[in-house]
Amino acid sequence: MEKQNHSNESSDGHKSSPLFSSTTFLLALGSLGVVYGDIGTSPLYSIRECFHGTHAIALNEPNIFGVLSLVFWSMTMVICVKYVVFVMRADNHGMGGIFALLALIPGDSGRISPRLHGVVAFAATLGASLLYGDGVITPAISVLSAVEGLEVATEAAKPLVVPLTCVVLLALFLVQRRGTGVIGNVFGPIMIVWFVTIAALGAGKIVDRPDILLAVNPVYAFEFFAANRFVGVVVLGSVVLCITGGEALYADMGHFGRNPIRLSWLGLAFPALLLNYFGQGALLLSDPNFAFNPFYGLVPRTLLYPMVCLSTIATVIASQAMISGVFSLTQQAIQLGFCPRMRIIHTSRETRGQVYIPEVNYLLMIACLGLVLVFKKSSGLAGAYGIAVTADMALTSILFFFVITRTWKWSLARAVPLLVLFLFFDLSYFGANLFKIFDGGWITLTIAAIVATSMITWKDGRAALARKILSSRLPENLFLEDVARHNPPRVPGTAIFMSVSPMGIPVSLLHHYKHNQVLHEQVILLSITSTDTPTVPDRKKLHIVDLGQGFYRIIASYGFMETPNIPTIMRLASMQGIVTDPARTSYYLGRESLLTGGDSKMMQWRKALFVYMSRNAGTPTAYFDIPPDRVVELGLQIAI
């Protein structure tokens, strides 16, 4: 099998497009509806939480200037410098995201010790787990904060906020099965309207108080901490809400490319957000009574209802982007061996990567609705929001450090100062958010702990199971010698034996041969492996070895953004001379019955968890799209 390329050079066509070409412009337009939904709707609650939240600061002119200075420099240093300038350079063949970053640090290359790579893999797993917590909170807080605009219009609408939010969220999750390809085409134009609108609203107030622009001076931020000390640090946990969703610039890079995302961020999203934030600051300088909801305070009263509608649509787009991101993350986790098999439905024939996972969708729906019903106000959820994002950003910085030192070969003299700069901001925000643990932050940490424990247990359990199976395998040369010596009867057709490892003879074949004493004319040993690249071209997917006597070994390589498909594999194999008749082909699968009494080093409760996850995992037949009427399952009892 060909060795996979670990270089940091992208094979993605979008990345190399010129910054100001028509293609880049169109991709930048499309990215507005996917990448910026979360960070683009942060003005709905970010400034409000600083002056009217659980950990609010006194509303006075020095504090307004200090908070706006922190907002400006947070967005500049974390989003513009860290992500746009540096992290987005670490693409894996055009793809971004925390698993793509992990794949750039291959453990089998000699660049990093196995023990250290295990620590790095744990960090990536923890980062991914935190994103699941984010995926639960984002739809709830975004839609709830938008619908709360009705309270500004009339106090009579207050009892309707929670029911309307639940209706919107319920509809959002129920339409996921239909895919987002069609409605996704209008997301970009809607977000253009959103950004232009919030920019205009903010600019209108800045004209009244242009002195608010002086807040770009970092001196105001230092004076803010000097004056407020501990309370100022706590408020930093609310300021960080202005950069939540910033990690999507990197995570969604594979869909649009580096230059289109940079263009859309610097050309529209970033300026529009700054204008709105500074406009809210100008409003509070003029009328402190709007501290309870400064975003809607910018809106003329006659336009409140249309603005609530636009805000709700924008938050639905933000929620959709997060839900799609969780689906994609789950697909990657399954392929990389961190998650049990689940039913993955591809919702678009034209666009790779648009997937729907029913189990994940309904778990998210139940969790989101539960949060809305329990907390009832977006301010209550704000405490749970920032801790996941800041922890994930810190873990991204650490993984990026390993990429630039182990893969790109940067010297420590260059890499360490950059890491220190990134972690200074990341850990400052994370530390400030620790004060929110009892105000809702525990929700995110609990979700992350459950997901991370499950992922690591599944990874370790599958490794222990693979070792157990391999230890009982017969070398292929001994098996083939036995077949040649006994010359068993051969029946017409093809038998395909799925194999965990591309070495030795699968236990399912040994059992079949032992009990039936017969073989098919053509026997294929099929192994599916995951690579450290997002996708594998069809021409490189298969590695075929003729073992003789009608036996063939096929090793199919799939990227971590792809879902293996047996019919596709057999079609590609036929193009290389391995011809099979679907009506005369049988698929033999080993079905393990797992016990916890084995000698593996896993703790007993983790063994029990792994056995439970295995029993509830999706079947290979459904996951690999194997024709169910051609499947033969052979039972095998294994103690781990």
Curated annotation (Swiss-Prot):
Q: Principal place where this protein is found?
A: membrane
Superkingdom as given in the UniProt entry: Bacteria
Q: Mind naming one GO cellular-component term on file for this protein? A: plasma membrane
- Molecular-function GO terms, alphabetical: potassium ion transmembrane transporter activity; symporter activity
UniProt keyword annotations, A-Z: Cell inner membrane, Cell membrane, Ion transport, Membrane, Potassium, Potassium transport, Symport, Transmembrane, Transmembrane helix, Transport
What membrane topology is annotated for this entry? Multi-pass membrane protein
Indicate the transmembrane segments per the record. Answer: 19-39, 67-87, 118-138, 155-175, 181-201, 230-250, 265-285, 307-327, 355-375, 384-404, 415-435, 437-457
Recorded catalytic activity of this chain's protein? K(+)(in) + H(+)(in) = K(+)(out) + H(+)(out)
Has UniProt tagged this entry with the keyword Transmembrane?
A: yes
Q: Does the keyword Nucleus apply?
A: no
Task: Give compartment(s).
Answer: Cell inner membrane
This chain's function reads: Transport of potassium into the cell. Likely operates as a K(+):H(+) symporter.
**PANTHER family per the UniProt record, alphabetical:** LOW AFFINITY POTASSIUM TRANSPORT SYSTEM PROTEIN KUP, OSMOTIC STRESS POTASSIUM TRANSPORTER
Family, similarity comment: Belongs to the HAK/KUP transporter (TC 2.A.72) family.
- Name used for this protein in its record: Probable potassium transport system protein Kup 2
> What is the protein's species of origin?
Syntrophobacter fumaroxidans (strain DSM 10017 / MPOB)
| Organism placement in taxonomy | Bacteria, Pseudomonadati, Thermodesulfobacteriota, Syntrophobacteria, Syntrophobacterales
